[in-house]
A protein has these predicted regions:
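Non-heme Fe(II) oxygenase catalytic core, chiefly the N-lobe of the double-stranded beta-helix
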Residues: 1-164
Length: 164
């Protein structure tokens, strides 16, 4: 599957997971209409586990909110998380991390504590960081598969207690 008016880019941090680039990195190649590409965007996100859109015309948090809304994905309120989140645009765009700049950012497991976590999570960088600024992402189901393979007894014990 290919996304119209985009080109595939590469990053040194990318990994191959089950034969696919993670995350898939796309740059613009002509005019881009996310609403017209909705099915392709969501399909590529499912196939690759994540898409990094690099260089597209999304200059403000409001433009980012519009981009997300054009994909017609159910909005899930941020409930029960330990991190501080400040609303930026309505109930769709929030700060992701309000830790001091020197603190490392752990992997995001957004709303892992709820029975039905969101199928899609979107991140937006409003201002480039002077240094650092990375947001690490991981495919939780791949981590679980590797952990299950390496430590099956531990996984069985945890699952027996009803912990997910």
């Amino acid at each position: 599957m290919r996304l119209p008016n985009s080109r595939v880019l590469e990053l040194p941090e990318q990994r191959e997971v089950r034969g696919r680039a993670f995350p898939l990195v796309l740059g613009p190649d002509g005019s881009f209409d996310p609403a017209a590409c909705r099915d392709a965007i969501l399909g590529l996100a499912r196939d690759h586990g994540g898409i990094l859109f690099r260089g597209f015309d999304v200059p403000t948090p409001e433009a980012f909110a519009t981009f997300v809304e054009t994909l017609r994905i159910e909005n899930m309120p941020y409930v029960g998380g330990a991190a501080v989140r400040t609303p930026i645009v309505g109930d769709r765009v929030f700060t992701a991390n309000e830790s001091p700049p020197g603190e490392p950012v752990p992997f995001h497991h957004e709303m892992a504590q709820v029975p039905e976590p969101p199928a899609y999570i979107f991140f937006y960088g409003d201002r480039p960081s002077v240094s650092g600024g990375e947001t690490p992402i991981v495919l939780s189901h791949e981590v679980y598969s590797c952990f299950l393979e390496e430590f099956p007894g531990c996984c069985e014990a945890v699952e027996a207690h009803g912990i997910q």
